[in-house]
């Protein structure tokens, strides 16, 4: 779950300019002094709270959105709102939850980390997704993200995960700013499985440009389970997020006994080329 937030921070400062001009981003810094959390992290925390407190997913997604509706990072240029117009309308009951947007994928990682059977992961992924993204495309995409996390937690390697989930995504160049699951899923899984550590997975994702904070949030959420995260990144992340985020994360990792800070050597057994 820290991986999702670190990914969000990594892509946060690039997203606005990418809406005007898609271009690759090459950097050695994952988190900079200007990095900030966005709706990706906020809604990830909404899902996590639902699990920790046994609360309704839809209720907390709407609650968190309304609570952070006026949130704006200390960074310019930026969007008028931290949430998409369509999601705000859904939150206020002005729009049905039939989106196929990549927001379904970016917030879902706690489900993959907090449940211990494949059935529970699938069931809760469906519940957490369908309220706002009730399309086959969005539900399928978020399910792939959570199952990738779940299988990595269980010790499957990259090749085994790709074969089990029938993942064969190719590298692609973004011609426009990506917002749908279909536009996003290829570059996320390509970046994840083409890397051999967390930082490289994020860097590969940034090189594709586009919806950088969401893309990196999705990849980071899965890369954490596959590769672990260096302790320095966790410490740096904690400087950029509110105390209530840190408290929920601490509680979640304590309950699950997950060790986010680890370095797992991964063989270069990629299927994706």
Question: Residue ranges of each PLM-predicted region?
Answer:
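Structured, active/binding-site neighborhoods that engage oxygen-rich ligands
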Residues: 1-273
């Amino acid at each position: 779950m820290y991986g999702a937030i670190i990914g969000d921070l990594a892509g946060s400062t690039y997203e606005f300019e990418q809406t005007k001009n898609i271009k690759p981003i090459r950097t050695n810094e994952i988190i900079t002094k200007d990095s900030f959390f966005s709706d990706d992290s906020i809604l990830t925390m909404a899902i996590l709270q639902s699990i920790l407190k046994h609360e309704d997913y839809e209720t907390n997604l709407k609650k968190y959105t309304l609570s952070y509706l006026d949130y704006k990072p200390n960074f310019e240029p930026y969007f008028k709102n931290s949430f998409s117009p369509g999601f705000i309308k859904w939150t206020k009951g002005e729009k049905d939850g039939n989106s196929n947007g990549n927001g379904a994928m970016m917030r879902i990682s706690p489900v993959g980390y907090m449940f211990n059977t494949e059935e529970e992961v699938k069931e809760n992924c469906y519940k957490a997704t369908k309220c706002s993204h009730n399309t086959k495309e969005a539900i399928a995409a978020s399910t792939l993200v959570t199952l990738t996390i779940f299988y990595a937690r269980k010790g499957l390697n990259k090749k085994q995960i790709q074969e089990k989930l029938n993942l064969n995504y190719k590298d692609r160049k973004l011609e426009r700013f990506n917002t749908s699951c279909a536009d996003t899923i290829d570059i996320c899984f390509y970046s994840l499985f083409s890397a051999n550590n967390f930082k490289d997975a994020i860097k590969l994702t940034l090189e594709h440009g586009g919806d950088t904070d969401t893309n990196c949030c999705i990849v980071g959420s899965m890369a954490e389970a596959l590769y672990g995260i260096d302790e320095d990144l966790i410490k740096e992340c904690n400087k950029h997020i509110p105390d209530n985020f840190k408290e929920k994360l601490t509680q979640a990792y304590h309950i699950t006994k997950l060790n986010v800070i680890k370095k797992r050597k991964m063989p270069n057994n990629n299927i994706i080329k």
